[in-house]
Amino acid sequence: MRHLGRFASLGLVASFATIVVAVTEVHSSPRGDRGRSTERGAALVPQVRSLLAAKCFACHGPDEATRQAGLRLDTIEGQRADLGDGFVSIVPGDAEASEVFARVLEEDPDLRMPPPEAHPRGLSSDEVDLLRTWIEAGAPWGAHWAFLPPSSESTAHSLRETIDLEIAERLHLAGLEPHGRAEAAAQLRRVSLDLIGLPPSAEEVEAFLADPSDAAYGAAVDRLLASPRFGERWARWWLDLARYADSKGYEKDDGRTVWPYRDWVIRAFNEDMPLDRFAMEQLAGDLLPDATDETRLATSFHRQTMNNDEGGTSDEEFRVAAVVDRVNTTMEVFQGLTAACAQCHTHKFDPITHEEYFRLFAIFNQTADADTPDEKPTLAMKVDLAWLDAPLEAKVPVLERVAEEARRETRILAGGSFLSPTELVEPGVPAVLLADRIGVSMPRDRLELAAFLFAAENPLTARVLANRIWAELFGTGIVETVEDFGIQGSPPSHPELLDALANALREQGWSLKRFLREVVTSET
């Protein structure tokens, strides 16, 4: 398998080429051909959305508390708003009649937008051209791409064929030629590092080179996927996402017993536990109807938060900090969203309100753990280690739901401070994730949230995980900002390929090994 490191900027080249083509075609299109013009303008929406998010949304975006002059530019209704006195924010098809565009060109610094004190350089000439072209093309808008369901168009091609076709097409558009196939020894070394994190032994290289058959590479891939080192290599990837640490952090940074969770992750990957079950046990293993010590151990995913053993600290302050960390980690890992920005105020760029953040918080707020030196609740486990004469009892911090009579009420914390509780809220998720698509009811606990995240209609989870795996293999994600699928994140360099990967991951039963085999046996 050849890595795309040398083509890391290919997606950007292709995206830029798309923009140039779209801009050129719009300017050369007949003025009356509104249908074609709008269709071409739609190609510019991701770039326009990113531009407005970076330069305008802080004052004219989702956050009502900081919105200036009543102007909102993150919705089509706000963009088309009548500002009074004959002024309209954006007039589709007529940039010169659009007040937003006029303010961008305004020479008076007191009237120019964005304000010089916020953006001293204003918009570049390329950004002005992009805005003008988009408005002249009808100012199309619509939901952010990541909140739309992946394309489900059927294809006669396998995933590996789809990968090769998509990459070859973009190389052609960019005027690039693919490199020839790597030498056999290099192929084996690369796939070994990808799948088990170790180079092949001299004996393995010799055996591979001695077999010239077409089946040799596939057999090597199968051997690597079956290796116990596979789980160790991919556990390193996951444990980084889970913020795993063998110490508690803060000033004392004492050690803690969490390695059984690490070993659980390794076992799960070696056994090819489906990723939806893998996630469900970590998010809510204690709530499963058939909960076992193993599923409870998996909830240590939530207990990787820092723990403060210093005297004189507020237990409630650090308990709240731990719940906040769980909300932020869950949304970032599985949804690719920077929900943390809504902890103190409504998100400045993405459609997540301050209230919706604390509805998520309420889902994680019903746990029995606290910021204490013993890190209760813990799970006592007998562990047999080869170098010990007797089994070792490990007490692993896990998550446990509080008793019904001890359930906490959840209030919005003004400014994110545990000292400033305000209105009561019920458990839930941001409305943008519902959008009348998800085939489950509003989640009210961690188990329902896990089901919600992996519902077939959820537009984010499969894309985010497929992109994370792709980035782990190739060094760069199809969405370069692997942690941010929101409005300020990078648009996908190959959107059709990303959707094909997401659909395949789900259709293959969330099997990591099957997914990896398809990718590493492609010509890419």
Task: Give the role of each language-model region.
Residues 3, 319-326, 442:
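Juxtamembrane loop-transmembrane helix junctions in multi-pass integral membrane proteins
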Residues 52, 334-340:
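Short metal-coordination and nucleic-acid-contact micro-motifs, chiefly zinc-binding Cys/His arrays
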Residues 21-132, 136-164, 168-169, 185-190, ...:
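Solvent-exposed helix-loop boundary motif
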Residues 56-59, 341-345:
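Short cysteine clusters
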Residues 1-42, 224, 238, 245, ...:
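N-terminal export/targeting leaders of redox proteins
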Residues 322-332, 456-461:
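Short pre-active-site segment immediately N-terminal to the catalytic Zn-binding motif
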Residues 122, 157-189, 194, 198-229, ...:
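Primarily short, surface-exposed interaction patches in extracytoplasmic proteins
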